[in-house]
Amino acid sequence: MNIKQNGFTLAELLVTLAVFSILVTVGVPSFNQTLLNNRQVSSLNILVGSMQLARSEAIVQNRRVTLCGSDDSQTCGNSWSNGWVVFVDGNGDGQVNGTEVVLRSVNDISRLGITPGGFGNNFMYRPNGRMMANNNIRANTGQFTVCDIRGAEHARTIVVDSSGRPRASKYNIDGTAPVC
């Protein structure tokens, strides 16, 4: 009685493993780049969304709404890299006080470095939707530079124009490349 056996020979198995290892070696680094790109774009979108929320709430409520960097997602701090807070700034001092309504707080932003340019630790949207930085009515444009572990080559910028509208860009306001 002849029994036919099904399966792979050792040579077929070794060839399959070799092809698989080549594909993994080529594919994993590009997957890592895709993952880093997605983290950066996601954080950019969250920050732009927070700016759009602040601007629209300032117009709708006819009040000043402030965004500030935050270390604990509850109070204003010295860094934007740990997160930020969006709040209705009733007294216009640029700080979250006990009676002010927090509209959004963001933390854990995927290990990115966020550096504000032109508006320091906080900026405010006025009831007309225009931006004001550091309580200076003339400071009405600015940018954020967002960097990850890949450095300046992959940095992105959020540019806020004089009307207060934020947009993501590969370049600074003046057209130069961002620096991390």
Give the positions of each predicted feature.
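N-terminal single-pass transmembrane signal-anchor helix
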Residues: 1-31
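N-terminal helix-rich module
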Residues: 2, 26-42, 46-48, 52-56, ...
